[in-house]
Regions:
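Long, low-complexity, charge-biased intrinsically disordered regions
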Residues: 1-200
Length: 200
């Protein structure tokens, strides 16, 4: 069973790294770690966007889990168990034009958050008529040279998701209000989007 924890204020503490210098867990503990990560991975796919980033960090240590990673896995599981009775009241926003569905995408990223490889992490959340239907926390494949570039990469991934969802909705005869709004908080990334030819 899980040791008793105070209810964590957040699901994760910070970045994890798989290091050759740190001792690895016993084979039994390694199996427990992978099973625990598998359980929380299932949750983020279906109902717990709040733990997405913490679980993404846990997956980095699947090949060699360390005591620090195991402790973080227990923290995430404690957070899930101790917040299982909490929830969000979902109340869809009725569009002014009931024939059109409203989509809003929120996109964000850190910059070079992983000190080992300097790669950034993209985060996104897609709301359909005010209800969160798609979310993701994912490490970027390339190294961004600035915070604006990291945001720009995150936006490009978010827009791919928007295009996919719009295509799915329109394939079942649901019309989407256009243009779809993408919320971003870095002016440099907004400039790059509006002037894509100058940033290529």
């Amino acid at each position: 069973g899980l040791p008793k924890y105070k209810t964590p204020g957040t699901p994760g503490l910070g970045l994890l790294k798989a290091s050759d210098e740190e001792p690895s867990l016993s084979p039994e503990k390694q199996t427990d770690y992978r099973s625990g990560v598998g359980m929380v991975l299932f949750l983020i796919k279906h109902s717990r966007p709040d733990i997405s980033n913490a679980v993404r960090e846990l997956t980095k240590c699947l090949t060699k889990a360390t005591p620090a990673a195991y402790k973080e896995m227990l923290r995430v599981m404690a957070y899930v168990l101790q917040t299982s009775t909490l929830g969000l009241k979902i109340k869809p926003i009725v569009p002014k034009d009931k024939l059109l569905w409203n989509l809003v995408m929120w996109s964000d990223s850190d910059w070079a958050g992983d000190k080992n490889d300097r790669r950034s992490v993209s985060g996104m959340g897609l709301f359909v008529c005010g209800v969160l239907v798609s979310w993701r926390s994912k490490q970027q494949k390339t190294v961004a040279l600035s915070s604006s570039e990291a945001e720009y990469i995150a936006i490009s991934e978010a827009v791919k998701e928007v295009v996919f969802v719009v295509n799915v909705l329109e394939s079942i005869k649901i019309q989407v209000e256009k243009p779809v709004v993408v919320k971003v908080d870095i002016m440099g990334a907004i400039f790059m989007c509006e002037n894509s030819t100058s940033s290529s």
